Design a protein with these regions (language model features):
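Active-site catalytic loop in hydrolytic enzyme cores
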Residues: 66, 92-168, 176-177, 181-191, ...
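Short polar catalytic/cofactor-binding loops
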Residues: 10-17
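Extreme N-terminal starter segment of soluble prokaryotic enzymes
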Residues: 1-7
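Cys-nucleophile CN-hydrolase/nitrilase-fold catalytic domain and related Cys-dependent amidase chemistry
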Residues: 17, 26-113, 179-196
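C-terminal beta-strand edge segments of enzyme domains
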Residues: 206-294
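Conserved hydrophobic/aromatic positions in well-ordered beta-strands
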Residues: 7, 102-104, 112, 217-219, ...
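CN hydrolase (nitrilase-like) catalytic-core segments centered on the catalytic cysteine
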Residues: 66-84, 156-247
C-alpha cells in the first residue's frame, strides 16, 4: 500500500474573503502537484482567524454560510484535483457563528461538517456557538478507505476530544490550529497520538501571523516497531519550521494498522465502567470559572 500523503497548508491569510479563496485554491493545486491525498488548512481560513483586537460585530459580519460560494469552491476543487480538502471558515449559524471545518472527499462530497466544541470562552470566542459533537467518516483515498476525524485548536487541550474520535474509529485526526505551538502543546499532540494509537495532523499559521509560530506537525501514533520493541521511537514524522509553505507528511497506514491491532493503548484495555466521574457536570474549586459557558 502506498503511503497516505497529508499536506499541511501553513500559509498566511490575506485581507479579504476573495483573496483567501484565490490563495487557498492556489495552494491546494500546489499540494496536489506534490502528490497530496489530503490538504488541510489552518483554523478559520476564510478570515484568517482575525477575531482579536477588533469589534465583535465586525468579525461576526464576516461569517459565511456552509453552502456559500467560498466553501463550495473547495468542494468543486477537491473533485477537480481528485484530492480531499479540509477547509475551515467562520460559519454563519442561526443568529450567531461557529468555528467550522468541512471535509470534502476527492469526489467533492461533504463527509462531515465539524464545529469547534471547546470554544475559547475565556476570550472573544465566547461569542461563537460551540459544536455539538465529534465526527468521523470513511474517506476514499488512493490508499484505500481511511477513517478520518477532526478537532480544532483548543479541542486538543482536552484528552476527551481525541479519545472520542478514537472510539469512533478515527485512524487519522485532522487539527486546524491558530496559536503558538510551543513545547507543551506539541507534547499534548504527541500524547494524544500515543495514548490513542491514532495519527494526528495539525496545521497552524506561520510565524508571520500574530500569535502563531508555524510548527505544524504530524504524529503517526506508532511508538514501537515490531522488530525493535525494546526501543521506543519518536512518533513525530513531520514538524514544520515557522515559514510559510506546504509541508507534506507520508503516513504508513499499514504500519499504523498493524500497531493498532496488537498494542495496548487505544480501547484495548480501557475500563470505562470505572470512569463515571468523567461524565459528572458539577465543577468544584479550584476549577470554577465565572466565564465558563453554562
Amino acid at each position: 500500500m502506498k503511503k497516505l500523503k497529508i499536506a499541511l497548508l501553513q500559509i498566511c491569510p490575506c485581507n479579504t474573503l476573495d483573496e483567501n479563496l484565490k490563495k487557498g485554491i492556489e495552494f491546494c493545486r500546489k499540494a496536489k502537484e506534490r502528490g497530496a491525498d489530503i490538504a488541510l488548512f489552518p483554523e478559520m481560513w476564510s478570515n484568517g482567524y482575525n477575531i482579536y483586537e477588533r469589534p465583535v460585530h465586525a468579525w461576526l459580519a464576516e461569517a459565511i454560510d456552509a453552502d456559500s460560494d467560498f466553501v463550495n469552491a473547495f468542494g468543486k476543487l477537491a473533485r477537480e484535483l481528485d484530492m480531499a480538502i479540509g477547509i475551515t471558515f467562520l460559519e454563519k449559524y442561526a443568529d450567531s457563528a461557529r468555528n467550522t471545518m468541512i471535509l470534502f472527499d476527492r469526489f467533492g462530497d461533504n463527509k462531515f461538517t465539524y464545529a469547534k466544541v471547546h470554544t475559547c470562552d475565556f476570550s472573544v470566542e465566547s461569542n461563537l456557538t460551540p459544536g455539538e459533537d465529534f465526527y468521523t467518516a470513511e474517506l476514499d483515498t488512493h490508499c484505500g478507505m481511511v477513517r478520518i476525524g477532526a478537532m480544532i485548536c483548543f479541542d486538543r487541550e482536552f484528552p476527551e476530544s481525541a479519545r472520542i474520535l478514537m472510539l469512533r474509529g478515527a485512524e487519522v485526526i485532522l487539527v486546524p490550529n491558530a496559536c503558538p505551538m510551543e513545547i507543551n502543546r506539541l507534547s499534548q499532540l504527541r500524547g494524544r497520538a500515543y495514548e490513542n494509537m491514532t495519527a494526528i495532523a495539525t496545521c497552524n499559521y506561520p510565524a508571520s501571523v500574530p500569535d502563531c509560530n508555524g510548527a505544524s506537525t504530524v504524529f503517526d501514533g506508532v511508538a514501537y516497531l515490531p522488530h525493535d520493541m525494546d526501543c521506543s521511537r519518536d512518533t513525530c514524522i513531520l514538524q514544520a519550521d515557522g515559514s510559510e509553505g506546504i509541508f507534506v507528511a507520508e503516513l504508513d497506514l499499514e504500519q499504523l494498522r498493524r500497531y493498532r491491532s496488537s498494542e495496548v493503548h487505544g480501547n484495548a484495555f480501557r475500563r470505562p465502567e470505572k470512569y463515571s466521574a468523567l461524565t459528572e457536570t458539577k465543577i468544584n474549586e479550584p476549577f470554577i470559572r465565572l466565564d465558563r459557558r453554562k
